[in-house]
Amino acid sequence: MNVTFLGTSSGVPTLTRNVSSLALKLSQTAEVWLFDCGEGTQHQLMKSNIKSSQIKKIFITHMHGDHIYGLPGLLATLGLSGNSNGIELYGPSELKFFVLSALKSSYCKLSFPLRFKEVEDKASFNKILFENDKLKVHCACLKHRLPAYGYRVSEKDKPGIFDIKKATDLNIPPGPIYSELQAGKTVKLKDGRSFNGQEFCGPPRKGESFVYCTDTVFSESAINLSKNADLLVHESTFSKEDEKMAYEKLHSTTIMAAKTALLANAKKLIITHISPRYTQKSLIKPSTLLLEAQKIFPNTYLAKDFLTAKIK
């Protein structure tokens, strides 16, 4: 899996950063899952290597405009392109009213179904939000000025590496049989021999995990959601020098994001949702924010629009 940052600015777009959106590209399928959809997201998609037709799920963290104003326009465009299978939208209960009101008011009729999934109950009781045979999604309540939710996508453990040499040495014919053996199944050959697939595979490989936390001030629930994550994407709106403002607005500083990653034992941190007050011409620059976080959590990176990063 990998992520592409489509918007990394806090509150308003700038000449170099659009407002919040991130695309998660799944390695198991051709699907793309979108996290937040600020104004201008569909323009960012056009400039990226992400195909909007592959978007199957959209996860909204909260109802502030810089995270949702691009949603009606994107859905309308997808409707013109004929996304026949529909899209699932996860988020606060107000999300359905916002989207349907915008579409109705603009006389927009989509050619595909929308399926809304409210996340409040799942977040409050730490229940699984979505699960299939390869992935599961959890969410958690964050700490912001209005209800906000972080999301965790966890890949289930994968079969161990298949020992092809062992199979060929035993004259097992290549083809679909190898796939069955790799899945751990017992296979019977035409010559009467039977083989247990588990004898040909190494130990299971741990699946990848990705966590997206924005908007929030320092939060225990964000730490718990991020436990042992391979990649944590965490908002870092303010410098440590502006900590007072962070607490007033319930946003995170670089130090808060780094401490969350450290306490969660995350493998890698990418900070995003950068306040437009920090520019190359300001006293505190974006590079300053990165250095602040790296002093606490060395394996930290600074997000920028169109950055693509592997989960693991």
Swiss-Prot record:
The cofactor note reads: Binds 2 Zn(2+) ions.
Output the InterPro entries linked to this UniProt entry.
Metallo-B-lactamas (IPR001279), RibonucZ/Hydroxyglut_hydro (IPR036866), RNase_Z/BN (IPR013471)
- Quick check: keyword NAD in the entry? no
Keywords of this entry: Endonuclease, Hydrolase, Metal-binding, Nuclease, tRNA processing, Zinc
Q: Which amino acids does the record list as binding Zn(2+) 2? A: D66, H67, D215, H273
According to UniProt, the reaction catalysed is:
Endonucleolytic cleavage of RNA, removing extra 3' nucleotides from tRNA precursor, generating 3' termini of tRNAs. A 3'-hydroxy group is left at the tRNA terminus and a 5'-phosphoryl group is left at the trailer molecule
Any idea what this protein is called? Answer: Ribonuclease Z
Q: Write down the species.
A: Prochlorococcus marinus (strain MIT 9515)
Q: Which gene encodes it?
A: rnz
